[in-house]
Each structure stands twice: as structure tokens, then as C-alpha cells.
């Protein structure tokens, strides 16, 4: 994998999201990888597979990435949602309780992962301490703890993403909840 930084495009620099540079992740043990870093690794893997014309499924990953870029351009034209954030002490979480300007409709997993990052970073920018993206599993039975990120397969990355998304959906357990719906939708696309 290349050691590039993926800067995700936004119309509003306050809400810009930078994916963690790959060189900061490749030597980490898989047990030390947080939720947002798994999402970042998915973006890095997609970008690299889209650029690798020798990979037999190159066209799929290239299509996925180009569709993601088009989705972001559409969202930029439509405007980014302004959300009302609420601290939910009962469930020990930060909730989005309303959205002004909707997100564009999409079934692209990269766009939906980007949306999850946008929502969770929006909460941080609103002044709330939001540890959900920094969450790390203490025990991961699916992989050995000694595995280094650069040795992890694409299948294992998506298995980890599924575990983190399952945690995310359970954290935002209310079915009508925006975060729960988004996490469930991403999980549905993965299955």
C-alpha cells in the first residue's frame, strides 16, 4: 500500500475529515487500531486497489471510488447537513436529534462510511467529547493480537469493520436513531 494521505473533500473546511495517513498505521498491531483507523484502512485499501490495474477486481474498486467522489460532489452542491446534537446522559452517548438539509441518497459503502465520520466529527466540532471513533476492542478473537496492520487481509479488514459497526449500532440502539440507521445500512451492504 502507498503511504499517501487521503483528504476527503468537503465544502466546509471546519468539517473536513482527513483519513489517518497509512504510514502511521502499517506498523501498528491490529489490537491497537481504533474504529476510525479501520475506516481509514478501508479507504486506503479501496484507493490502492482502484489504482492497481493488475488486480483482477480493479474495475469494481475503481467504480466504487469514482462513485464516492461523485457522491461527495453531489453533497457539496446540495450542501452539508446542519445537525442538532444532544448529550444523552442516560445512554452515555452523543445523539443527533435533527438534521437540517438531508444527506444525498446513496448505496455506496465509502460514501456511507464517510457520512459516519462526518456525523461523529460533527459532534466533536460541536464541543462534545465523543469517544466512539477512538474505541478499540480489548479482545479480538478474529485475529491474533500480534498481527501487524500491513499483514492483514482485505477480508480481515472488513471483518474488523463489521465488528466495529456492530458495536456502533448497539451503542446507538434505538431503531429510529440516525446513527443506528446508518450503521445498520452499512452492515446490510457488507452482508
UniProtKB/Swiss-Prot annotation:
Give the top-rank taxon of the lineage listed in the UniProt record for this protein.
Viruses
The name of this protein is Uncharacterized protein L231
